[in-house]
Amino acid sequence: MKTFTPKPADLTHDWYVIDATDVVLGRLATQAATLLRGKNKPTYAPHADSGNHVIILNADKIALTGNKLGKELYMHSGRPGGLRRDSYAQLLKTNPERIIKSAIKGMLPKNRLAKVQLDRLHIVRGAEHPYAGMKPQVFEIAQVSQQAK
């Protein structure tokens, strides 16, 4: 019996929608990274692009546990003096998409395939999204008993 290797014609890219209301950031990021890589499919191969599209709704309503609101998210442009520091509390008000995207990006592999997979991530602040024509499947994240409020 030969080992199955998926060809590009065998790969499909499904659409999933996740509601991020009161979901802890790390739990949301791990589930989204798994879907983006396509690890939920039987045809998964680490070298093949078998990932899915993931739509995350209500990005401004995610839950941050512990004292993350006081911590900062760092980004550097590569130029002298290009260090940018933004606190999570400020980013949650102005740009919650950046918080979620950076958490998911850290959970993807560090290779060329990660950029392709990250391009399939669609983050929306509200409850409505423009991807209804793709007929996304609802993906539920199991909540843990204790929640950060």
Swiss-Prot record:
Checking InterPro entries in the record gives: Ribosomal_uL13, Ribosomal_uL13_bac-type, Ribosomal_uL13_sf
- Family stated for the protein in its record: Belongs to the universal ribosomal protein uL13 family.
List, in alphabetical order, the GO biological process terms annotated in this UniProt record: negative regulation of translation; translation
> Which PANTHER family does the entry link to?
LARGE RIBOSOMAL SUBUNIT PROTEIN UL13M (PTHR11545:SF2), RIBOSOMAL PROTEIN L13 (PTHR11545)
Query: Which keywords are on file for this protein?
Result: Ribonucleoprotein, Ribosomal protein
Q: List, alphabetically, the HAMAP family matched.
A: Ribosomal_uL13
Q: Does the keyword Cytoplasm apply?
A: no
Which species? Answer: Bifidobacterium adolescentis (strain ATCC 15703 / DSM 20083 / NCTC 11814 / E194a)
- What GO molecular function annotation could you give as one example from this UniProt entry? mRNA binding
What does this protein's UniProt record list under function? Answer: This protein is one of the early assembly proteins of the 50S ribosomal subunit, although it is not seen to bind rRNA by itself. It is important during the early stages of 50S assembly.
Protein name from the UniProt record: Large ribosomal subunit protein uL13
Q: How does it assemble?
A: Part of the 50S ribosomal subunit.
| GO cellular component, as recorded | cytosolic large ribosomal subunit
